[in-house]
């Protein structure tokens, strides 16, 4: 099933959202140009020193005069260094397409002003009217600036989200935290809840199992909670296994283009290929290991589920952190544009990775939650092939043996 065939633009939007699958080969070149842009910040009109001057004037105009860095971080949820880097990414697009953006008093908005508006909109989840009132501009200006920012980030920040060419470090970290060998990622799905008119028949496809209208985001995550692959846009009515099987990630793995590295021997007749882990909502596959459902019936099953749970925490916490920091996709969105929403979700994922890549520790002192889908029950998928079940059993036996001899 395709994602909403009645919307002609939908497939184009999804292809754009899942483009990290297609653009991995160009990531290095894009990364180099972005690094050059970052290194040239000293020569930019928006360099660090001038950016400090901008915050001084901006904060006095909007927030009553506090120029404390902590105030900046509480407003935008990122450090000044990260903010300046994001400005450097979008500068070319914002200046190449001049627009007469101004506040309510007719004062032109600088690059930093516009990035601030977009980040506040994405980070706070506040309505266009509230953002407009806060920043002293009309709602349409807030909307146009935010969308231009989203379009620019899709292109300029794509190198921050791509499948890695080497997985050794990722596998090593997963084994260190969970004891699972050859694990390359953790997968999970979260719901972006929307308020849609229930009387419209076309909206029924968005109605999920918890009676919410929602759109899904599927993410594969590394041990550092960094997104490696994402796809957004499928209706919440679809089960996790259906979303998975319609994703670019699934198709690439099935074609042997992902998770195709070194295999580890488990026994004389069984090898453990590269794989990811996911909860019981996903099918048990040779490359996707899920936990034993119900109450474990043996020590090996108990040991496997324990280790599996440690590995899957990365995906759960990453999605929780994403929705907590970029609150436009948290809570309930009021009648969003369903063609644009997947692209907004994708840019929030890019921003999430940028914060990690910049080693930005803003808000790191806040406790991490594993709950990213409040009031959603865990659903179970019964799909499993015999070979995958045998593989999981042999891995469980080996893990239990290692544990016993430790």
UniProtKB/Swiss-Prot annotation:
Q: Where is the signal peptide?
A: none
Enzyme class (EC, first level): hydrolase
- Positions with a binding annotation for a divalent metal cation: 188, 240, 279
Q: Which parts of the chain are coiled coil?
A: none
Which compartments is it annotated to reside in?
Nucleus
Q: Does the keyword Membrane apply?
A: no
Q: Which GO terms describe its molecular function?
A: metal ion binding; nuclease activity
Kindly give the InterPro entries that the UniProt entry links to this protein.
HARBI1-like, HARBI1_dom
Matching entries from Pfam families are given as: DDE_Tnp_4
- GO CC aspect terms: histone deacetylase complex
Where mainly located? nucleus
Q: Where is this motif: Nuclear localization signal?
A: 8-15
Per its Swiss-Prot or TrEMBL entry, what cofactor is needed? a divalent metal cation
Q: What does this protein do?
A: Transposase-derived protein that may have nuclease activity.
Q: What is this protein called?
A: Protein ALP1-like
Organism of this sequence: Arabidopsis thaliana (Mouse-ear cress)
